[in-house]
Amino acid sequence: MVAQVRMGVRVLVPLGRSKTYTAMAMRLHSDKPEFETRPIIQVIDAEPVLIEQQLRLWQWISTYYMSPIGDVFKAALPAGLKAEENYRPKTVRCVTLPANLRSEQSLHMALTILKRALKQHQTFSTYLQLSHWSEIDGETPPEHIAEIACDELQNAANASDAVLRQLIQRNFLELYHREVGRLNTSGEYHPERIQPLSPAQHAAEDSIQEQFNEKNVVLLHGVTSSGKTEIYIHLIKKALDDGKQVLYLLPEIALTVQMTRRLQNVFGSRLGIYHSKYSDAERVEIWKKQLSSEPYDVILGARSAVFLPFTRLGLVIVDEEHETSFKQQDPAPRYHARSTAIMLARMYEGAKVLLGTATPSMESYHNACTGKYGYVQLTTRYKNVAMPEIRVVDTKDLYHRKMMRGAFSPDLLEAMRTALSNKKQVLLFQNRRGFAPMVECKVCGWVPKCKNCDVSLTYHRSMNMLTCHYCGYTYPVPKQCPNCESTELLGRGYGTEKIEDRVRELFPEARIARMDLDTTRSAGAYGRIIDDFSCGRTDILIGTQMITKGLDFSGVTVVGILNADTMLNYPDFRAYEQAFQMLSQVSGRAGRRDERGLVILQTKSADLPVIQQVVAGDFQTFAHDLLEERSMFRYPPFYHLVYVYLRHRNEQLVDSAAIEMASRLRQAFADRVLGPDKPAVARVKTESIRKIVIKLEQGINLPLARQCMAEARTQLLQDKRYAAMTVFFDVDPS
């Protein structure tokens, strides 16, 4: 068995009396370990399921993000590769001729016998027609005798299961199961379908190629609808012409649905798709194909696609690089796909990374301004289509004058009416799902809260339930207030469900759809909603941040941002950055073809500089002001941030542990440590949470800093009082 163990193969190891775990052979050595070992009882793989570059990347993720390598292993591998019995190849029931019937004489005899059973005779004759038996000469080797899927034969012959079963039992047909792939590998490569670039796009592509000669990472900063995707397609073709593979990362699965069609139209079966909406078995097959002699040349996927094996990676594209969705939150490893993709490219000689966005993250923009990254700008929309008009509506004044109709201002309603009368489409953005963000007693002000978490419950009218968006727990809606027994319980605020309800009242003739987490849970839901809107089968699409991220809808002329204040008032140092990005991105969905779009931006904070900068499309001024603040108050990109979280069911215990942990950290980092403090949501899933912030200046010895943090955690957990405490680090939080 020792000879079978190689780097990258899976092995089975017994832990305890009855548990067996799948482990990965990471390194072969003869050093005596400092811990008790367990014997390997089975080597699962004949060939490695991981390659050297993956192992190195996983080790980097484990080290940089301070996460156990086992957590990286669990996050990276599809579940079907974690234990051999979890994955089963997909098979199809097929029939073929038994060996004793593969001659004209024996077939003639079989048909004669079957004349007494008319339906069996018809089904057997249909098999011979489908298999083109009459065209096969007597010299055809047995393995080339046609095999027909049972479903195909039964449909063609209109035969029941019983008829087919009788033919098999009487040995007129032979049944077997043929292994088939779950993946769609159809479609030819059509480079001639690639659209020619405009002069501005051509200049941008040339500049990217030129800067790739000196820089490994280039930031493409192009306004919305400037044609960045077409530049990506040209760069992908060049990489394929050079015999290289391409990884194309997108932040949302919804985007991969629309992008898949564009890329498949050109790259056909050379394109593979990888994200969490695929079944586990499909992801296993993609993984195995990437290890085969004929892997996909282009992989399009969400953040987990960085874990796939590549043998000749040449280009990584991170589209919408600013998106916080690229950062994994829970569970560990809490990696950022953008940083991980850059590190992945370093594992391959000559591989380059292109970051694309209309609204760069402060980290990427700062790296471009300081020369660490290359920088290319696209300042005009494709075909010189005008940027949308952004009209700010001060809802504070309108609410005071009682001119609002629910969440809708007169300006927005008028714009929607005009668009619909002109057979155009409307996009409405509300970044809260559910019907009402909270329910409140009109008499005493009681608000129902989650019993597990420190949050109010959201009312979902479609289920008639109150739901916690943190732990998922649901509660029936009370008939009366438990505090004062009043029956006047009112929904406060507007979720996407309530907006949809109001829009149906205001525009009863319009075809309306909603796109949020609740409507996209089922397989194919993303595709159906996007298809219907793209093809004009939907007039008004209401959505959360899912609709802000790079989707391309040609018929949209009006975008309504119902409440910009929820983004601006979030208690986080990135709130304005993310608000600018989201508002600019959703505005960019308007007027992407021939007609100038209109954006109605509703806010009670119309005078804020960030709102004015969104209206003017003035990213440079916004970034300059924000970077000055970040530098002054010691935030990224000038400082590294590490959040230390402590969680436990006993609030007093987590308080004392947090104080002690902060004290230990201050011994190493002095005034770089802030806290402990309660986060915005201080209890989740019955556990109280405390947070410590560590700010580390650029140039600090990060390996030593990580060592000090890890030692502080180890020392804390050695105290018996805190042995059951959960303590983890969030490096570079988003």
Predicted regions and their residues:
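Short helix/strand-capping connector loops at secondary-structure junctions
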Residues: 38, 689-690
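A carboxyl-terminal module marker
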Residues: 663, 667-688, 709, 727
